[in-house]
Amino acid sequence: MKKSAFLFSAIALGILLPQGYSYAYLIRYFIMGILFFSLLDLKIDPKSALNPRLGTILAMMLAIAGTTAWVSNWFSSELALVAFVTALAPTAAAAPVMTKFLHGRVEYVMSSVVVTNSFSALALPLVLPLINPGDRVGINALALLNTLTIVLLPLIVTQAMQRWTPRLVTALVPFKGIGFYVWMAAIYLATAKATHFIQAESTSPWSLIVEIAAISLGLCALNFGLGRWLGGQDWGQEMGQSLGQKNTLFSIWVCLTFLTPAIALGPMFYIVFQNLYNSYLLAKGPRSESV
């Protein structure tokens, strides 16, 4: 609950004091730092990475992104982009921590973090031009390199450190909590950037913001609900977190870099909804069903 309070405070600060918007370029490096601390002591298990349930998660991400973008496009192309980018967001680095609190299989969810983040980093710059064939988005090597670097560089560095400097890894593990505060700083910058855009540049009606919030709420309910349903009694918690708790900060960076801050409102609203749901799960307590 305390972490949820920090989250809402960071969002409120970005709305009330948006002057930090000019530093939004730091979000890229903050994401890399968050992933670095999250993956610091990760032991890659090929069996977990090849779990067929991860294939189901990837298939559902694509299916939900494609379907919701298609439906939203009936209303506007802007809403279609919001739906697609939000739905294709990968599993959040915080999902394994949440799964541990809920007494689930942490190894599976951590594998989902690695696999889905790599997948989204590869897929988004390739698919976005098909969804939005405008001037700001294009299939080029630089866009692909930018997204892949954010995910793969922290993974490569942490795995190399485990192999060649294990003592340094052991010394850094107690500081993993720093990643949370880096996340809060990134959320503030993203909110400030979106707020400044709405106040100074956007010509869209306020009704669009309500529609974006509704799409994010619907996607959040669909992802968590579908994940739990697909996982059944045995894997519902793990698949629910893998599909539902998303690395929306990565999607926000994609929006700010390749699209517009208005599109970034989709994953920003999703952050609020997924944290409200996870706060409910924590208050409810670990699952009582047998595993």
Model features per residue range: what roles?
Residues M1-V291:
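Alpha-helical transmembrane segments of multi-pass small-molecule/ion transporters
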